[in-house]
Amino acid sequence: MIYVFDTSSLSKLKHFFPGVFKSVWTGLDGLVQSGELISTREVWNEIERGDVDPHTSQWLKDRKQIFTTPTANELRFVAQIFQIKHFQALIGEKQRLMGTPVADPVVIACAKIRQGTVVTEERLKPHAAKIPNVCQHASVSVPCIDLETFMQKQGWSF
């Protein structure tokens, strides 16, 4: 199974202090090495602009290979997502005006094309243009879970 991580879930890793939760980081490393944990270049760009704690930031820099460049098929699927007018709101006004990275549609497309699962901390909200809403849409149909569910699927407990 491939898991495509959104910025929100990678950022949440800061709560798992490496000195206390060594097994989390060991498990994540195993998934990175097997190619099961990936993300997108756009997520990396968001992380670089964000406020990520030093450990998580260094961990991600040391594993930068997980941040894939969108394929032609993924970009075509992003275009399909945006054909649904409501989902054009995935690109917020700030991103449009300032040209800041927009990872959400690329994360979804990456998971769709690679038959993976999106991992995000965004929540399903009625009538919203959020990752879970897009994933749930009939024309998209991509599994979407949060970090806690991801860890449960790995069989991790602390």
Residue ranges and their predicted role:
Residues 1-39, 46-60:
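Short, well-structured N-terminal submotif of metal-dependent ribonuclease cores
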Residues 4, 38-40, 119-120, 143-146:
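A structural signal for short, well-ordered beta-strand segments and their strand-loop junctions
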Residues 23, 55, 106, 129-133, ...:
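Short Gly/charged-rich anion-binding patches and loops
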Residues 32, 60, 110-111, 135:
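A generic structural signal for well-ordered alpha-helical segments
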Residues 41, 45-97:
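PIN-domain endoribonuclease scaffold, especially VapC-family toxins
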Residues 123-158:
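Acidic, PIN/NYN-like endoribonuclease modules and their adjacent C-terminal/linker elements
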